[in-house]
């Protein structure tokens, strides 16, 4: 009885130090490629939603992404004739035809880059931006200019990633889980979300909010402090909290209120841009 791709990848992971493009067995290559194709098509995901803020990480899928770098040599890659790249991972759109783009139903504005093994949902828009391997970008989401979606990050439906936003990846430094931005979130310009932080549905981050696992997320109404998670429907701005000794303040993300009609009017997506 043949092994499943998951069991092959789990075994290969334990022996990863000995893998190389020259020595990798065919079954490992086949299993890794099957995962990358599934990620590319959106049929396999690094993490799956169980409830609001509750996600199950498929660690074996993340391992397959990491193993793929052990199985390929760098090689020249064309870029429309204006330059070349030298890498292990080809563009998602390397062999796309007009029919493929039409079937995908998304827009890709030059010079946006998405690597093979990432998924882009229907009616999504990629302005000049970067989507890394393993990432998932949901339907109707806007990835604005110079925004980056890190490896294996999970971006929900109808999300707006504003200009210069950085969504962290899992590859280096290796993270236990991906950054997750749930449906209908708005991430303000130049904000950074890293280290597997979860932004729950309908949340709004203002411009310049930085959140990692050690960042205090302070709710000014309740006094509660969260780590690694922004509760659903929160409106978050950059701020600071005083130290215990009162001699200095440290950066914190401050929940100032819950999303209301006024907030939604300011952050609504423009359907005209999704056609």
Curated annotation (Swiss-Prot):
Gene3D superfamilies: Hexapeptide repeat proteins, Tetrahydrodipicolinate-N-succinyltransferase, N-terminal domain. PANTHER family: 2,3,4,5-TETRAHYDROPYRIDINE-2,6-DICARBOXYLATE N-SUCCINYLTRANSFERASE (PTHR19136:SF52), MOLYBDENUM COFACTOR GUANYLYLTRANSFERASE (PTHR19136). The gene is dapD. Substrate binds at residues 107, 144. GO terms for cellular component: cytoplasm. Belongs to the transferase hexapeptide repeat family. Pathway: Amino-acid biosynthesis; L-lysine biosynthesis via DAP pathway; LL-2,6-diaminopimelate from (S)-tetrahydrodipicolinate (succinylase route): step 1/3. The lineage of its organism: Bacteria, Pseudomonadati, Pseudomonadota, Betaproteobacteria, Burkholderiales. SUPFAM superfamilies: Trimeric LpxA-like enzymes (SSF51161). This is 2,3,4,5-tetrahydropyridine-2,6-dicarboxylate N-succinyltransferase. It catalyses: (S)-2,3,4,5-tetrahydrodipicolinate + succinyl-CoA + H2O = (S)-2-succinylamino-6-oxoheptanedioate + CoA. It is found in: Cytoplasm. One of its GO terms (molecular function) is 2,3,4,5-tetrahydropyridine-2,6-dicarboxylate N-succinyltransferase activity. It comes from Polynucleobacter asymbioticus (strain DSM 18221 / CIP 109841 / QLW-P1DMWA-1). Its EC number is 2.3.1.117. GO terms for biological process: diaminopimelate biosynthetic process; lysine biosynthetic process via diaminopimelate.
